């Protein structure tokens, strides 16, 4: 995709007409709701098998190949297996909350998809309707709030388990989502300023001919934040197997564990759909000559799904290539790098918006500033701990060892008066008073006649 300087123009405030979303018949609203629910379930089943096959290819393995054609029904087999597993509840668990927590984790993942536009207006059984369940004047804020509600299920699951490892995992998850939710919110601000609206349908319409991926810092900031938001590698610290066994879902089994698994992959699909809507034009075709006519009917739904799969592959690629960060590196990267860079980029965007007079002259400077800040973010991600800081720590440790006192200079307590007393040697098999301590041997085995 090529974005010229003249196409990236700050939009005037847009007030999209949202009155049509309440005019659909009830059966059509119900049909679209069921379709969104089925789409999320199918994408989850597909994502699980797709991830296993891609990671197997990266590791030069075969991957799942037993259930269904070439193993593509492996997710159904795993789901049936989990449903038939024994459902165990720890004795020290708070049972009502322990049972409710997986549901609280999965439901918000479905709610965020209510305002995602899948396509333009189409005809369904003679009724004209948009391929979107609902829209709001603050749809993006609604998605941000719905995505953050899932942390309550994680916290309650760790607290109600009555175990140390789940509690530590839930606390990590809460700190992680709070930290990266701020950076994710900052990545949205530039999109709001350019689109002039918080409505998802309005943002997609404003990207006709120009995608907001040109806002490089916002795009990079969101891509990093969405990985931290979903607890995926390299930010899967709440589920660190080497430290916390399984994290917040250590004590869960059977269908309750499947709910957590379902919530994780639905969250992946949700944040990928948000990225597609805000930065890749949603259901709009790529701004390439010759594709402008493929933006009506059911064809835009295909564009949306292809962009969604691109972000899902990005998640899988990170899992197969990057190691897990340390917890201190992860939190320092969020608070010391992502949030300051996000604030700096918002300041740059707001400055250009306020003092904008000649868009064609100022837009190249805006794109240049965005590229520089985006490169800073990528470099910081590749070196989260800071190589210079790490060398300083190692040098301080070497100085500390060099300055440590030797054994001769350590003041030792004086020996007891009269010198050390040594007990006389005692023959083996006897105690200090001379009695035998030999354990009698076992009797010989009976000989069968």
From Swiss-Prot:
Its EC number is 7.1.1.-. Keywords: Cell membrane, Membrane, NAD, Quinone, Translocase, Transmembrane, Transmembrane helix, Ubiquinone. It holds the Pfam family NADHdh. Coiled coil: none annotated. Its main location: membrane. GO terms for biological process: aerobic respiration. It is a multi-pass membrane protein. It is an enzyme of class 7 (translocase). It catalyses: a quinone + NADH + 5 H(+)(in) = a quinol + NAD(+) + 4 H(+)(out). GO terms for molecular function: NADH dehydrogenase activity; oxidoreductase activity, acting on NAD(P)H, quinone or similar compound as acceptor; quinone binding. GO terms for cellular component: plasma membrane. The chain crosses the membrane at residues 26-46, 96-116, 136-156, 177-197, 211-231, 259-279, 298-318, 330-350, 365-385. Residues 396-449 are annotated as: Disordered. NDH-1 is composed of 14 different subunits. Subunits NuoA, H, J, K, L, M, N constitute the membrane sector of the complex. PANTHER family: NADH DEHYDROGENASE SUBUNIT 1, NADH-UBIQUINONE OXIDOREDUCTASE CHAIN 1. Belongs to the complex I subunit 1 family. NDH-1 shuttles electrons from NADH, via FMN and iron-sulfur (Fe-S) centers, to quinones in the respiratory chain. The immediate electron acceptor for the enzyme in this species is believed to be ubiquinone. Couples the redox reaction to proton translocation (for every two electrons transferred, four hydrogen ions are translocated across the cytoplasmic membrane), and thus conserves the redox energy in a proton gradient. This subunit may bind ubiquinone. This is NADH-quinone oxidoreductase subunit H. It comes from Frankia alni (strain DSM 45986 / CECT 9034 / ACN14a).
């Amino acid at each position: 995709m090529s974005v010229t300087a003249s196409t990236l123009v700050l939009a005037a405030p847009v007030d999209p007409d949202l009155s049509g979303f309440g005019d659909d018949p009830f059966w059509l609203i119900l049909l679209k709701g069921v379709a969104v629910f089925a789409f999320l379930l199918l994408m989850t089943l597909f994502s699980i098998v797709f991830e296993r096959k891609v990671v197997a290819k990266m590791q030069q393995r075969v991957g799942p190949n037993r259930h269904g054609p070439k193993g593509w029904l492996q997710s159904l087999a795993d789901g049936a297996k989990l449903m038939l597993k024994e459902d165990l509840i720890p004795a020290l668990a708070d049972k009502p909350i322990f049972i409710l927590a997986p549901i609280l984790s999965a439901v918000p993942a479905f709610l965020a998809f209510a305002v995602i536009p899948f396509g333009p207006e189409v005809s369904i059984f003679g009724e004209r309707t948009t391929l979107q369940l609902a829209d709001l004047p603050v749809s993006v804020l609604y998605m941000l709030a719905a995505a953050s509600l899932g942390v309550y299920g994680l916290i309650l699951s760790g607290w109600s388990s009555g175990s140390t490892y789940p509690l530590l995992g839930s606390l990590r998850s809460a700190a992680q989502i709070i930290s990266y939710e701020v950076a994710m919110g900052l990545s949205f601000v530039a999109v709001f300023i350019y689109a002039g609206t918080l409505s998802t349908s309005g943002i997609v319409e404003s990207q006709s001919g120009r995608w907001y991926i040109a806002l490089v810092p916002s795009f990079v900031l969101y891509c990093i934040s969405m990985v931290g938001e979903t607890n995926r590698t390299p930010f899967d610290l709440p589920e660190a197997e080497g430290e916390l066994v399984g994290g917040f879902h250590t004590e869960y089994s059977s269908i309750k564990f499947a709910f957590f698994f379902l919530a994780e992959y639905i969250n992946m699909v949700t944040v990928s759909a948000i990225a597609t809507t805000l930065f890749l034009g949603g259901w709009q075709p790529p701004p390439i000559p010759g594709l402008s006519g493929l933006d009506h009917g059911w064809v835009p739904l295909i564009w949306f799904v292809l962009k969604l799969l691109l972000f899902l592959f990005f998640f899988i690629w990170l899992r197969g290539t990057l190691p897990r960060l340390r917890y201190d590196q992860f939190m320092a990267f969020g608070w010391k790098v992502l949030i300051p860079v996000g604030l700096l980029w918002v300041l740059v965007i707001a400055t250009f918006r306020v003092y904008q007079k000649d868009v064609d002259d100022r837009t190249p400077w805006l794109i240049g500033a965005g590229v520089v800040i985006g490169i800073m973010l990528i470099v910081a991600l590749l070196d989260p701990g800071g190589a210079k800081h790490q060398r300083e720590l190692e040098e301080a440790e070497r100085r500390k060892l060099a300055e440590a006192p030797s054994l001769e200079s350590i003041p030792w307590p004086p020996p007891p008066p009269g010198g050390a007393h040594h007990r006389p040697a005692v023959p083996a098999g006897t105690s200090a008073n001379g009695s035998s301590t030999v354990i009698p041997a076992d009797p010989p085995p009976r000989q069968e006649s």
